[in-house]
């Protein structure tokens, strides 16, 4: 049988076969042995030795590309190889026969050129053995394929030379020796040998895990896998890589199909490595059910996942497989984590994992416990102590992936508690770390979910501080590192949409913000509904906004999403006082404050106090409002977003002006001067985030204060700024005092 110039008989009996490309590699090895040591420098020989391994392990490539790779290492040898192949291809069949007869001489003599047990020696012996098993008709077909391979290579070389003459400025990009397999390389090759297939699969699996951008596209990879499976349907590893590839495109049917085929083939090929056949069979069955449960859970099919998990537990109990049962226990927690008693299950899972010596599962359990306790309002020091214990496990067992997850989780916890400086430090720590995993297959970066989460936090933190250019650079890096079709792309898509939404709202472009709500809702339904209510509120559609917020509040309370519950309560309170009902807003704000204190959400608590102070200002008690502000303003100025800093300083100015109404003239003038300084600081904060609507409000207040102090020139300057912004921005008929 012959396919694409590859002569092979029984695919399951022969681990390697002869192809035109491998003949070219044999010519290279032969020329390296014939060339004297003086003809090739030590540096060139070192480069050639480094080149050999990817040439022997990788898939077949075109002859022109092979010439280029050899020429980069040793131009003289590339010319010799080209001449030798040309003489063989343009000669007769006996030239190829003689070439293979001469290969055996490499092992002869007291000091042979090649040792039989070396990598090159094993390759030569495999090729000689495979060639000797060919019939005469197969040898003739191989020689015909070699001629065609040479002609295609010569044609490509001429075309490249013409292109170089037409455009001398374009330089050929140098290929690294360990680059990932390119699509054009794979497409030119025939069916891979067993070693080539194993190398290809391990390379693509490593790329899918760590650097998906360098892996083949889903369609191209699936095409190659189908080609592999066509010649060897029982290749279990190919089925598993097909399963991973289908997960990239969210194809639940094909991924399930490939996963089941993988475990079927494990049983057929005896890959379980068990002396007892029944034990290996049962192991495949229970782990197949467990992986099927994980797959259904990934796609949100929780009922099917629970049924598959029950099947895995039943088989594992029959076989007394404690390791499998521990995995099942972990997935039971994932499926039932919304239940009130789920933490008991998780604690039991961690204890059992430690007992059976499963550090990976134990660490995952600890991190899940930390996440659950963070949402339950436990103190940060206890959570960090627990993460420190899990980090000891990571470093002890070199669990690189879990180290990354731990640091990313610390970043998220610090942001949850409103400590942006600590979150920024943790995110940068993760990005500057080197992975403990060996870098192979050209993987130079760790493109895991942890890195995507850390980069998204970094972009949002920069955007909060008004550094939109820096946030844009981070997002650009995210888009390059995680393309839109990759599995973690939704993280940066949501982050990008939220930043654009906030900028549009700050700039008063509510129609643009409204158009972004659809994209946010597609990625995160709760966040999208909340943002829709914010837009409606900004457009003075109070009735619609109130209905939406009430529905969202009920839903989030049911889900126990405390952070969103507090945000919704703050929006409801703002809606009340903008509707001239500040007394109704007070109980809502007190409820939000109680939740913030209970769950130790410091930043949300400070923001709630800020809103309480504003409500008291509206109710005519500015002195009490100032007292509250002194409690809340320090965390906001230390860790808050620039917009919140501006709002806080603006509110301080309003309270100072309102409190000065009963002062004597001298003290009142001092209070107004202090208020003007605070207004200038607030204006600087608003300018950083390009919030022109609030700058307009500040300019209005400054003009009024300067007028009260008799400073005509400063008043006119502020009035001019106010007028310019008032003409540019739409007026919604909301009194300035009712806008925090």
UniProtKB/Swiss-Prot annotation:
Pfam families: ANAPC5, Apc5_N. Its main location: nucleus. Keywords: Cell cycle, Cell division, Cytoplasm, Cytoskeleton, Mitosis, Nucleus, Phosphoprotein, Repeat, TPR repeat, Ubl conjugation pathway. TPR repeats lie at residues 194-234, 235-285, 286-322, 323-363, 364-403, 404-451, 452-485, 486-525, 526-565, 566-605, 606-645, 646-681, 682-721. Pathway: Protein modification; protein ubiquitination. It is found in: Nucleus; Cytoplasm, Cytoskeleton, Spindle. One of its GO terms (cellular component) is anaphase-promoting complex. Signal peptide: none annotated. The modification Phosphoserine is found at residue 180. The modification Phosphothreonine is found at residue 217. Component of the anaphase promoting complex/cyclosome (APC/C), a cell cycle-regulated E3 ubiquitin ligase that controls progression through mitosis and the G1 phase of the cell cycle. The APC/C complex acts by mediating ubiquitination and subsequent degradation of target proteins: it mainly mediates the formation of 'Lys-11'-linked polyubiquitin chains and, to a lower extent, the formation of 'Lys-48'- and 'Lys-63'-linked polyubiquitin chains. The APC/C complex catalyzes assembly of branched 'Lys-11'-/'Lys-48'-linked branched ubiquitin chains on target proteins. The mammalian APC/C is composed at least of 14 distinct subunits ANAPC1, ANAPC2, CDC27/APC3, ANAPC4, ANAPC5, CDC16/APC6, ANAPC7, CDC23/APC8, ANAPC10, ANAPC11, CDC26/APC12, ANAPC13, ANAPC15 and ANAPC16 that assemble into a complex of at least 19 chains with a combined molecular mass of around 1.2 MDa; APC/C interacts with FZR1 and FBXO5. Belongs to the APC5 family. This is Anaphase-promoting complex subunit 5. It comes from Mus musculus.
């Amino acid at each position: 049988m012959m396919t694409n110039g590859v002569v092979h008989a029984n695919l399951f009996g022969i681990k390697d076969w002869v192809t035109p490309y491998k003949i070219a590699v044999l010519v290279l090895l032969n020329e390296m042995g014939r060339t004297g040591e003086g003809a090739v420098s030590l540096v060139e020989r070192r480069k050639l030795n480094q080149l050999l391994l990817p040439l022997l392990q990788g898939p077949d490539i075109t002859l022109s590309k092979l010439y280029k790779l050899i020429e980069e290492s040793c131009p003289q040898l590339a010319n010799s190889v080209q001449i030798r192949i040309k003489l063989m291809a343009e000669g007769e069949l006996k030239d190829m026969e003689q070439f293979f007869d001469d290969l055996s001489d490499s092992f002869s003599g007291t000091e042979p050129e090649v040792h039989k047990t070396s990598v090159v020696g094993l390759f030569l012996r495999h090729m000689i053995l495979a060639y000797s098993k060919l019939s005469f008709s197969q040898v003739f077909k191989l020689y015909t394929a070699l001629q065609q391979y040479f002609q295609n290579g010569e044609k490509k070389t001429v075309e490249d030379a013409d292109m170089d003459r037409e455009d001398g400025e374009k330089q050929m990009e140098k290929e690294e020796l360990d680059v990932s397999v390119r699509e054009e390389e794979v497409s030119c090759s025939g069916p891979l040998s067993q070693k080539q297939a194993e190398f290809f699969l391990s390379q693509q699996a490593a790329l899918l895990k760590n650097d998906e951008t360098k892996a083949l596209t889903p369609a191209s990879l699936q095409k190659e896998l189908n080609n592999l499976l066509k010649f060897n349907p029982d290749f279990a590893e190919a089925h598993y890589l097909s399963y991973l590839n289908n997960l990239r495109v969210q194809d639940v049917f094909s991924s399930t199909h490939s996963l089941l085929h993988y475990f079927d083939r494990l049983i057929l090929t005896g890959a379980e490595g068990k002396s007892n056949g029944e034990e290996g069979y049962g192991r495949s069955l229970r782990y197949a059910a467990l992986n099927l449960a994980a797959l259904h859970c990934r796609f949100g099919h929780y009922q099917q996942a629970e049924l598959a998990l029950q099947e895995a537990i039943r088989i594992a109990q029959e076989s007394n497989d404690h390791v499998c049962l521990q995995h099942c226990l972990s997935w039971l927690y994932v499926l039932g984590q919304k239940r009130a008693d789920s933490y008991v299950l998780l604690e039991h899972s961690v204890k059992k994992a430690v007992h059976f010596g499963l550090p990976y599962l134990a660490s995952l359990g600890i991190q899940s416990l930390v996440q659950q306790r963070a949402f339950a309002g436990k103190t940060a020091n206890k959570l960090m102590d627990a993460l420190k214990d899990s980090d000891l496990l990571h470093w002890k067992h070199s669990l690189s992936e879990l180290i990354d997850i731990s640091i990313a989780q610390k970043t998220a916890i610090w942001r949850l508690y409103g400590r942006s400086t600590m979150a920024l430090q943790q995110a940068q720590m993760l990005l500057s770390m080197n992975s403990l995993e060996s870098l192979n297959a050209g993987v130079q970066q760790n493109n895991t979910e942890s890195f995507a989460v850390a980069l998204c936090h970094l972009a949002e933190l920069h955007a909060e501080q008004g550094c939109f250019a820096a946030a844009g650079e981070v997002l650009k890096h995210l888009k390059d590192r995680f393309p839109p079709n990759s599995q973690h792309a939704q993280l940066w898509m949501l982050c990008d949409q939220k930043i654009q939404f906030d900028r549009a709202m700050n700039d008063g472009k509510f129609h643009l913000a409204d158009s972004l709500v659809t994209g946010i809702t597609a990625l995160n339904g709760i966040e999208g509904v909340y943002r829709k209510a914010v837009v409606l509120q900004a457009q003075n559609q109070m009735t619609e906004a109130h209905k939406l917020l009430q529905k969202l509040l009920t839903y989030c309370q049911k889900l126990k999403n405390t952070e969103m519950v507090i945000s919704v309560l703050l929006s409801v309170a703002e809606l009340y006082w903008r509707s001239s009902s500040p007394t109704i807003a007070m109980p809502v704000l007190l409820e939000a404050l109680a939740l913030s204190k209970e769950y130790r959400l410091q930043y949300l608590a400070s923001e709630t106090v800020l809103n309480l102070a504003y409500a008291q200002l509206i109710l005519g008690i500015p002195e009490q409002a100032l007292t509250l502000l002194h409690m809340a303003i320090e965390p906001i100025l230390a860790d808050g977003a620039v917009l919140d800093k501006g709002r806080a300083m603006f509110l301080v100015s309003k309270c100072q002006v309102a409190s000065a109404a009963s002062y004597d003239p001298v003290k009142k003038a001092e209070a107004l001067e202090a208020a003007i300084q605070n207004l200038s600081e607030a204006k600087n904060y608003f300018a950083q985030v390009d919030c022109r609507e609030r700058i307009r409000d500040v300019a209005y207040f400054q003009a009024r204060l300067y007028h009260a102090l008799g400073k005509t020139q400063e008043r006119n300057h502020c009035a001019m700024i106010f007028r310019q912004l008032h003409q540019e921005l739409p007026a919604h008929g909301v009194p300035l005092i009712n806008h925090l």
